[in-house]
UniProtKB/Swiss-Prot annotation:
EC identifiers of the protein: 2.1.1.178
Pfam families membership: Methyltr_RsmB-F, Methyltr_RsmF_N, Methyltranf_PUA, YebU_pre-PUA_dom
NCBIfam families: nop2p (TIGR00446), PRK11933.1 (NF008898)
Keywords assigned: Cytoplasm, Methyltransferase, RNA-binding, rRNA processing, S-adenosyl-L-methionine, Transferase
Protein known as: Ribosomal RNA small subunit methyltransferase F
Location(s) in or outside the cell: Cytoplasm
MF terms (GO), sorted A to Z: RNA binding; rRNA (cytosine-C5-)-methyltransferase activity
Reaction equation(s) it catalyzes: cytidine(1407) in 16S rRNA + S-adenosyl-L-methionine = 5-methylcytidine(1407) in 16S rRNA + S-adenosyl-L-homocysteine + H(+)
Database matches in PROSITE patterns: NOL1_NOP2_SUN, SAM_MT_RSMB_NOP
Length: 479
């Protein structure tokens, strides 16, 4: 693999020499940083099994190497990378996999280690969504996830990735993560804080990542991280699990933040060692039981992961003085809910008791039951999935609901050819050789739901959302 030139400030190199364990070679560290990052993907088990995904992609000649800490994760090598971007493959467009850096799969592996099965989880800094979607897959779309993102521009990307992966158990918020300890005390079984950091571990992806690096900046970031972990710890229930992670390498933003929390709440913080998380984890193990992953150890990004347990309650923070405002939704009454469920089933949309129907004006939504305890305590940017809009003739089913809820075995399912599927993703109407019988058609490709179409004569009217329409080269290689 070709080398690329990474910018290293002298003070950073000095700091890394001091931080690196004697068992590791500093020259190996420098050499690893100069190598471009290996591409990696995670199979979305909400949509397909790993075995079925491997069978589906076998004809492509992709080389898929298992990632030791994530059984759904693979490093990927492709001969056709220049001809077709990974994000334009049919399997990516239909949500069968997520392009995710291997080391960023570690925090969720730690969160669910040792049989941990949380029912209400918070992802404090969630965009662009790799870890939220990984958590949802581990929970099998059950329970509830609060996915928060402070950056307004990234909330939209977060929602798009959640929708593409067919996730229904997520509520989105847009706050500074420091508010949750006061706003939602002891409300979560598990919390992931993948903290904003100095990004020292990402130089293999971005050779200029350290252009603005300074020791002073590390200290400022660490101060924010301490406030974030303190807030998250307050929001965690007694007995719950907190995973703290960064994509940086200095101790100030990593071990020191966790040690500060333990010094602050000595009787409530227990470090849970990660040496048995996967075979070979001990190569990155610190004396505290954290994983401090230098890039040469597993040939991935630099990363840090710590797992903590809250052993007892801690004094509550002052109750916030802000007003949440009126919640604009109301539960759907039983009789109407039965009608909606029957109408939805007729086009192949079904859901279980983890979701409940709510309405706002002419909109019908499905919210995860596990999030209802938070209503009135925090303002949501988006909650659950929008199922339908009502109109004179019935319901206008929404694309995100089709992707999350549709069964490809429904009698109205209509399988497209590769060329027809590509036309669909380009936002064009489809003219199949043999038109389906039903008026509302569940459009599938590779036996995966990709949308809902209206049959008008021999034409399938495209309903693919305009903001998702793709240009350029797609999977049939026709631009």
């Amino acid at each position: 693999m070709a080398q690329h030139t990474v910018y290293f400030p002298d003070a950073f190199l000095t700091q890394m020499r001091e931080a690196m364990p004697s068992t590791l070679s500093f020259d190996d560290f420098l050499a690893a940083c100069q190598r471009p990052l290996r591409r990696s993907i995670r199979v979305n088990t909400l949509k397909t099994s790993v075995a079925d995904f491997l069978r589906l992609t076998a004809p492509y000649g992709w080389t898929l190497t298992p990632i030791p800490w994530c059984e759904e994760g693979f490093w990927i090598e492709r001969d056709d990378e220049d001809a077709l971007p990974l994000g334009s493959t049919a399997e990516h467009l239909s949500g069968l996999f997520y392009i995710q850096e291997a080391s960023s799969m570690l925090p969720v592996a730690a969160l669910f280690a040792d049989g941990n099965a949380p029912q209400r989880v918070m992802d404090v800094a969630a965009a662009p969504g790799s870890k939220t979607t990984q958590i949802a897959a581990r929970m099998n779309n059950e329970g509830a996830i609060l996915a928060n993102e402070f950056s307004a521009s990234r909330v939209k990307v977060l929602h798009a990735n959640i929708s593409r992966c067919g996730i229904s158990n997520v509520a989105l918020t847009h706050f500074d993560g420091r508010v949750f300890g006061a706003a939602l005390p002891e409300m979560f079984d598990a919390i992931l804080l993948d903290a904003p950091c100095s990004g020292e571990g990402v130089v293999r992806k971005d050779p200029d990542a350290l252009k603005n690096w300074s020791p002073e900046s590390n200290q400022e970031i660490a101060a924010t991280q301490r406030e974030l972990i303190d807030s998250a710890f307050h929001a965690l229930r007694s007995g719950g699990t907190l995973v703290y992670s960064t994509c940086t390498l200095n101790r100030e933003e990593n071990e020191s933040v966790c040690l500060w929390l333990k010094e602050t709440y000595p009787d409530a913080v227990e470090f849970l060692p990660l040496g048995d998380l996967f075979p070979g984890a001990n190569k990155a193990l610190t004396e505290e039981g954290f994983l401090h992953v230098f890039p040469q150890i597993y040939d991935c990004e630099g990363f840090f992961v710590a797992r903590l347990r809250k052993t007892q309650a801690i004094p509550a923070l002052p109750t916030p003085k802000y007003k949440v405002g009126n919640f604009p939704f109301s539960p759907v009454k039983d009789r109407e809910a039965a009608q909606i469920r029957q109408a939805a089933a007729s086009v192949g949309l079904n859901w279980d008791g983890n979701l409940r129907l709510w309405q706002r004006d002419k909109e019908v939504w499905l919210f995860p039951v596990g999030i209802e305890a938070l209503i009135g305590k925090v303002r949501f940017s988006r909650l659950g999935i929008k199922l339908a809009e009502t109109h004179n003739k019935g319901y206008r089913w929404q694309h995100e609901a089709v992707i999350a809820l549709a069964s490809p075995d429904n009698e109205n399912a209509f399988e497209l050819t590769p060329q027809e599927a590509e036309e669909w993703y380009r936002g064009r109407d489809v003219y199949p050789q043999a038109a389906p019988v039903a008026d509302d058609v569940l459009v599938t490709f590779q036996h995966q739901p990709i949308g809902l179409a209206k049959r008008i004569g021999s034409r399938l009217k495209n309903s693919y959302p305009r903001e998702l329409v793709r240009d350029g080269k797609l999977f049939t290689s026709n631009a």
